[in-house]
Amino acid sequence: MQSLRKSLLQFVFSGASMRRWNDKLRPSELYEVDKQGHKMITAFLLYRLQCRKLGMEEQLKLGREVIEGALFDYFYRLVITDIKPPVFYRIRENEEQYRQLTDWVLGELEPRVRPLHEDFWQRLVAYHSRPVQELTGHPSTADRILRAAHLYASRWEFGLIRPLNHFDEEADEIELSFNRELQSMCSLEGVPELMAGTGNALVRTANLCGQLRFQIRWSQTPRIPETAVLGHMFIVATYAYFLSLSLGTCDARALNNFFCGLFHDLPELLTRDIITPVKRSVATLPDIIHQCEEDEVQRRIFQPLAEGGYADIRDRLRYYLGLDAGSEFKETIRGADGTVQEISGFDELNDNCNANRLDPKDGKLIKVCDVMAAFMEAHSSIHNGISSPQLFEAIARIRGEYGRLVLGNFNVGTLLADFD
């Protein structure tokens, strides 16, 4: 039986404590989960550019390969956390050593991942069992998208720490390596723009999104780890994809749910993370905040994208943010002409609209994943010895509001009870 378990949620969340550039002087801590969020936002932009020349089935296939390839790489990275990239690349050059390391990693991943979905697990095994020559000599389009996105997000981080590490003998070589490898990928549409700097609307969007790693959630509540908005969005996206697999959604719905989770807090780049009690303090405040967010997103992201020749990307982001339905947490489908139609609820979407041609997107499922990620933040901090009344209140509120909720074959309360 397919099931989403506590151990997998915690495993994904553990990237919030995994420091990056740990051997360099850093202006602030940089965490793996934030880098993964930035990487996947960049990968989305590159993916949508490739979709311009693909049919629907090819788009869905490529989208699944991009998302799952990113998750498979992230899982591997979490297991080999202490191996620096140069050392890992040396290991990968020796096929026998790489196979032994991969066999060990798969053994660590199996009890966490396999219960979620057997086919997903088999795809993970196949992904990490590919010959090294295939990865380096004949990469797929998805591989190239993910590699370029990884390089861009890592180079972005390095740009933060470079001025502080003028004494570091490795700094020049690291910078040269990033630029050289990105330059070698310029045949992939979108990469030349990433190399060109912030004058392009595509790069400006990726750059703005990267700044969400500086915005700490629960900013007035001490926590360990102190998750940022960027990492939170990646965690919500990952949970949404897991739930989509567990529910047996169509490919379009699974992809839409991942990307909706990935972008659901994008407007907070422009208005900051406003905590739930404040939002609920005045009856009209949520509407005021929502309108401010929509206006700012239109001015700083959507309008530049449209004017820069990326109206198709703007339209997808509008759909994920639920701007035509009033909220990202509403179930929607899209007609052949692109018209967005709101669906009455989860059951209606799940029973009657689970088809690629309808381009379905969940609402309540995304909200549940958002709440589960917040629950993980509060629960993990308390477990790590940092507690406060606000964290206990958040856990109690989530249990009270979602403890009896059932989405298809997924019982939210049963999963929450595993954390007792």
Where are these regions (language model features)?
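Alpha-helical, largely C-terminal catalytic domains
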Residues: M1-D420
